[in-house]
Swiss-Prot record:
Name this polypeptide is given: Probable pectin lyase B
Native species: Aspergillus fumigatus (strain CBS 144.89 / FGSC A1163 / CEA10) (Neosartorya fumigata)
GO molecular function, one term: pectin lyase activity
Cysteine disulfide partners in this protein: 82-101, 91-225, 321-329
InterPro entries per the UniProt record, alphabetical: Pec_lyase (IPR002022), Pectin_lyas_fold (IPR012334), Pectin_lyase_fold/virulence (IPR011050), PEL (IPR045032)
């Protein structure tokens, strides 16, 4: 009888062990990513331990079971910044990072800024890592992640990254990717971020998939002074291939995303809801295939004044895509929103022979399926 009493406990532990790991597989450009593979899961208990696991040279599956709060761990800085968007209580102000205020906003009012140093630079993530959250428990607060300088084969799934100096532009980014390859970010929630939720820098980042993520733009501070975050997704790489699928972008006001450099972007089945300014900025060197997306209460689906790149996407299905990606393109949908349209076949030619994500009809499902806790 004593042995029998232990059986449920053993069974529960076995079930938990089986459940710990990456769920599903990436679609699109990062479809061959494996992350930490079958490495034995590790469970950091301190911020130092988390930093160590992410930054070492071992293949790892790293499981977050609690909040790792970096706020205050590196002290604070008080300095003079600027207020380019005004001094009202709901406006972001800027840190004078690299003399940005001095060189580019010399006419803006000067203001005192006090920011948390930990947010300024994210945690380095080295190659062959899977960083996953357990349920809704895995949170990194006050500091982001940096996947840079040749890092590759990385999966980030089912975590939240929050509260990185939200009042301050240049206060820090949630996820930075630069000169990387095979990165899959899936079911991640980002909220109350000072600068970009996602930024792909000017170096080439070859195969990236951002899927089923919740970009929560609601904030007490914004550059548009209206509780809608302006700095959301910035894709600026010299040779980037990015799949953006199934994401929910809520209460944004710009750069959602901003695409330029030499970036191939497949934006498919995303849901933009309550955007007070514009979603896409499509600049020089951007090739954007947009299909099956829903824009609801979005003032402008694409900013016309900065539109110098290439776009294929419309409100009707297109058989033109068949000879390039092996299927028809799916119509975008618009509700109380500005529209986007483009029929540049040069865009489709960039995707020929590439691993392209599937597409379904536009809808609101990302609102309930994207982000942490919705695997």
């Amino acid at each position: 009888m004593k042995y029998a009493a232990f059986l449920p406990t053993i069974g529960a532990l076995v079930s938990q062990a089986i459940a710990i790991g990456v769920q599903g597989t990436a679609e699109g450009f990062a479809s061959s990513v494996t992350g930490g593979g079958s490495a034995t899961p590790v469970y950091p208990s301190t911020t130092d331990e988390l930093v160590s696991y992410l930054g070492d040279s071992e293949a790892r599956v790293i499981v977050l079971t609690k909040t790792f709060d970096f706020t205050g761990t590196e002290g604070t800085t008080t300095a003079t910044g600027c207020a380019p968007w005004g001094t009202a209580s709901g406006c972001q102000v800027a840190i004078n990072k690299d003399n940005w205020c001095t060189n580019y906003q010399s006419s803006a009012p000067s203001v005192s800024v006090t920011y948390d140093n930990a947010g300024s630079l994210g945690i380095t993530v080295n190659s062959n890592k899977s960083l996953i959250g357990e349920g809704t428990s895995g949170v990194i607060k006050g500091k982001g992640l940096r996947i840079v300088s040749g890092a590759k084969n990385i999966i980030i799934q089912n975590i939240a990254i929050t509260d990185i100096n939200p009042k301050y532009v240049w206060g820090g980014d949630a996820i930075t990717i630069n000169q990387a390859d095979l990165v899959w970010v899936d079911h991640v929630t980002t909220a109350r971020i000072g600068r970009q939720h996602y930024v792909l820098g000017t170096e080439a980042s070859n195969r990236i998939t951002l899927s089923n993520n919740y970009i929560d733009g609601e904030s007490d501070y914004s550059a548009t002074c209206d509780n809608h975050h302006y700095w959301n997704i910035y894709l600026d790489g010299s040779s980037d291939k990015v799949t953006l699928k199934g994401n929910y972008l809520y209460k944004t006001s710009g750069r959602a995303p901003k695409v330029q450099g030499n970036t191939y972007l497949h934006a498919v089945n995303n849901y933009w809801n309550d955007n007070s300014n514009h979603a896409f900025e499509i600049g020089d060197g951007a090739y954007v295939l947009a299909e099956g997306n829903l824009f609801s209460d979005v003032t402008a689906a694409v900013e016309s004044s900065s539109f110098t790149g290439e776009l294929f996407g419309s409100a009707s299905a297109s058989s033109t895509c068949q000879s390039y990606i092996g299927r028809d393109c799916v119509a975008n949908s618009f509700s109380s929103s500005g529209t986007l349209s483009g029929s540049n076949v040069d865009v489709l030619s960039k995707f020929k022979g590439e691993t392209v994500a599937s597409a379904s009809a536009a809808g609101t499902s990302p609102a309930s399926s994207a982000g942490q806790g919705h695997l």
